[in-house]
Amino acid sequence: MGQKVNPKGIRLGIVKDWDSKWYANSQDYSKYLLSDIKVRDYLFDKLTNASVSRIQIERLANNAKITIHTARPGIIIGKKGADIEQLKSIVSKMMGIPVHINIEEIKKPELDARLVAENIAQQLEKRVMYRRAVKRVLGNTTRLGAKGIKVMVNGRLNGAEIARSEWYREGRVPLHTFRADVDYSSYGANTQYGVIGIKVWIFKGEILNHKKGTLDEVARRGATNQIAQKIK
C-alpha cells in the first residue's frame, strides 16, 4: 500500500502537516478550496525563479496568513520589500481579505524533494544527460545528510523512440513506515522530445516523538467519545 499512495498524503497528521489550515461550513468549503488552488497556482507561476517548495495557507477570522518556503527569499522580498508588498496586495484582492505573507528560508535545498525534482528538470531542459543529472543529485543529497533518496525519470530519455522508465536509488526509502519522514514531489521537464516526468522521494530519518494531534490521539479521543455515549 505504501508503494502506491502519495507519501505525503498518507502521513498527514502523523509526521506531516496540512498545507491549508482552516475550518468552513458546507457552503463555504468549495469556495475556500478553489481560492487556495488559484492562489497557489498564481504564486508558483509568479515565483518560478525563486525556488519555492511549499505554500501554506492559514485562514483566521477576517484575514489570512500565507507562508512561502523558498531557497531564495531575496527574490521574493525585493529591494526594500517592494516586491513582497506588491505580491501581498494582489493576493489580498484574489482572496478578498487582508493577507500577511511570511517568508521561510530553506537552508538545505538539496534535501527538499520539490527543489531536487525542479533542479533535475532544469538540467534536462538544458540538454544535460539524464544519468549525469540524476547521479549528481543523488551524491549531493546523501552528502548533506539524507538517509536515502529515490528518483524515477519517465519519458523519451535521450530522445529514444519508445518511452521508458528508469529508477535510481541511494540508501533506503521506507515507504511502509509511517513514522519515516519521507519527502515526495513530482515535476515535468519540457524537452524537445516531449515531457519527461520526474519523481523524487527523500528519506530524512524517523520521527519518534509524535506531535499533538496525531492519528493515534485522534483515534484515542474517538474511542473515549464512543464509550461516553454508551454510558449515557
From Swiss-Prot:
Intrachain disulfide bonds: none
Supply the InterPro entries for this chain: KH_dom, KH_dom-like_a/b, KH_dom_type_2, KH_sf_prok-type, Ribosomal_S3_C_sf, Ribosomal_uS3_bac-typ, Ribosomal_uS3_C, Ribosomal_uS3_CS
A GO CC term assigned to this protein in UniProt? cytosolic small ribosomal subunit
Q: Which UniProt keywords apply?
A: Ribonucleoprotein, Ribosomal protein, RNA-binding, rRNA-binding
Protein purpose: Binds the lower part of the 30S subunit head. Binds mRNA in the 70S ribosome, positioning it for translation.
Q: Which CDD domains match?
A: KH-II_30S_S3
Decide whether keyword Ribosomal protein is in the record: yes
**Any single GO BP term:** translation
According to the record's subunit comment, the protein's assembly and interactions are: Part of the 30S ribosomal subunit. Forms a tight complex with proteins S10 and S14.
Organism in which the protein naturally occurs: Ruthia magnifica subsp. Calyptogena magnifica
Task: Provide a Gene Ontology MF annotation, just one.
Answer: rRNA binding
- SUPFAM superfamilies the UniProt entry points to: Prokaryotic type KH domain (KH-domain type II) (SSF54814), Ribosomal protein S3 C-terminal domain (SSF54821)
The superkingdom of the source organism is Bacteria
Can you name this protein?
Answer: Small ribosomal subunit protein uS3
Q: Which Gene3D superfamilies match?
A: 3.30.300.20, Ribosomal protein S3, C-terminal domain
Q: Looking at the keywords, is RNA-binding present?
A: yes
Annotated KH type-2 domain ranges read 39-107
| SMART domains in the cross-refs | KH
Database matches in PROSITE patterns = KH_TYPE_2, RIBOSOMAL_S3
Family, per the entry? Belongs to the universal ribosomal protein uS3 family.
